[in-house]
C-alpha cells in the first residue's frame, strides 16, 4: 500500500482500454495516403481468400472464414456465419466486430445479406442475424 506522499509524487495510472476490433477504429484518407482515427460500426472490404479453419482443442469442425482487405487497407480474418455461403475471392463484403471464441485470430464477422454476401437460405428463426427474408405463407 503506497503512502499519501508516494501517491502525490507519482499518481496511479488509469488502465488503457484496448479495443476488441481495432481495424474498425481506423479510417483512411486516400488523397493524403494517411490513416485517420475514425471509428465505424461496420466496414466494407474485398475478400482476398476464402477457406476453412479447424477450431481450438475441445471442438472439432471446419469453420468458414474469409481474409478481407478493408477500405482502410488493413487486412483481417473474418468469420462467415450460417450454413452455406456464396463468397469467393474478390467478393465485396461488410464486416462487423465480434470474435469467434474457438478460432484464434478471428475478431470479425461478415454481415450476411449485405453487399455481395447472400443471406442464409431456408432460415426460419433468427433470420435478421443471417440476412434471410421472411418466408411466404
UniProtKB/Swiss-Prot annotation:
It holds the Pfam family Ribosom_S12_S23. GO terms for cellular component: small ribosomal subunit. Keywords: Ribonucleoprotein, Ribosomal protein, RNA-binding, rRNA-binding, tRNA-binding. Residues 1-21, 33-57 are annotated as: Disordered. GO terms for biological process: translation. The keyword Acetylation does not apply. One of its GO terms (molecular function) is tRNA binding. NCBIfam families: rpsL_bact (TIGR00981). Part of the 30S ribosomal subunit. Contacts proteins S8 and S17. May interact with IF1 in the 30S initiation complex. Belongs to the universal ribosomal protein uS12 family. With S4 and S5 plays an important role in translational accuracy. This is Small ribosomal subunit protein uS12. It comes from Streptococcus pyogenes serotype M1. The gene is rpsL.
